[in-house]
A protein has these predicted regions:
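A short acidic, glycine-rich active-site loop
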Residues: 13-28
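Structural beta-alpha unit
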Residues: 1, 35-67, 164-197, 203-207, ...
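Charged helix-capping and loop-helix junction motifs
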Residues: 81-84, 153-156, 186-187, 211-216
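Intrinsically disordered or low-complexity boundary/linker segments at protein termini
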Residues: 45, 58-141, 221-231
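Short, well-ordered secondary-structure micro-motifs
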Residues: 58, 79, 108, 123, ...
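Short, small-residue-enriched loops and turns at beta-alpha junctions
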Residues: 75-76, 145-150, 176-179, 205
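Small/aliphatic-rich secondary-structure junction motif
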Residues: 1-14, 90-93, 106-174
């Protein structure tokens, strides 16, 4: 049984009526802050629930085109904060993961981290609204040296696909270096002045836990720029 936490949004069997009332008050206060921040310029709706955050987020995703969520840099207590990775893999919607240090997103230059996978194909499709508005789009495949010819063919096809959507993109194929692939693509994006990275999110469920691919895990924990990820 999960412990009761004063700031959490989960009801436990031993929570008193007073505890539950406190949580409802905190949720109401959070709703007030949300509405104040949104202002009257946008049509918004506040929804809340006294449930496990990840489960609630996955459920509410049914009526969303895109989920925007802040990347947490602290140790995660999933009774307080949504498990971003599990939500991405379970919601069936694209996620825009925003580092806490990012205050705005122009998406003038978007880097697409390409692999010829279902997840990457879906990510490109989900990112089309951003790609249409971008001033520059780069599709990059970082691969082993003996895969560069096949990678170039795949990247060229993606560039052609985007051109059919009236999106001008440039293709790049880079040799994978020693170390983290996530660090390499982040470094490329930063050097090129990109502020949005589009990638597939890779993982699978085992024994009721989500097991992530190394690239996905590293991007979720260390990327200093916004990531649009789809599973």
């Amino acid at each position: 049984m999960p412990p009761f936490v004063a700031e959490g949004v989960v009801i436990v069997d031993n929570a008193s009526e007073f505890d539950i009332a406190q949580m409802k008050t905190r949720l109401a206060e959070a709703g007030d802050k949300f509405r104040a921040a949104a202002g009257a310029s946008y049509q918004t709706e506040w929804r809340s629930a006294l449930e496990i955050p990840t489960d609630t987020l996955i459920g509410e995703a049914r009526c969303a085109d895109l989920i925007v969520i802040e990347k947490s840099s602290r140790s995660i207590d999933f009774y307080r904060v949504a498990d971003i990775g599990a939500a991405i893999l379970g919601a069936g919607r694209p996620f825009l993961v925003v580092p806490g240090s990012v205050k705005s997103l122009t998406a003038d230059h978007v880097v697409v981290g390409w692999k010829d996978t279902r997840e990457a194909r879906r990510a490109i499709q989900d990112a089309l609204p951003f790609l249409h508005k971008a001033k520059r789009v780069t599709v990059i495949d970082i691969c082993e040296n003996d895969r560069k010819e096949a990678a170039r063919h795949g990247v060229d096809d993606v560039v052609l696909y985007l051109a059919r959507h009236r999106i001008k993109a440039e293709g790049r194929v880079e040799t994978q270096l020693l170390g983290s692939g996530a660090d390499q693509i982040i470094g490329f994006a930063e050097e090129e002045g990109a502020d949005l990275l589009v990638t597939g999110a890779y993982g699978h469920s085992r024994l009721n836990e989500w097991i992530f691919g190394g690239m996905t895990r590293d991007l979720l924990t260390s990327s200093p720029i916004c990531c649009l990820m789809s599973h």
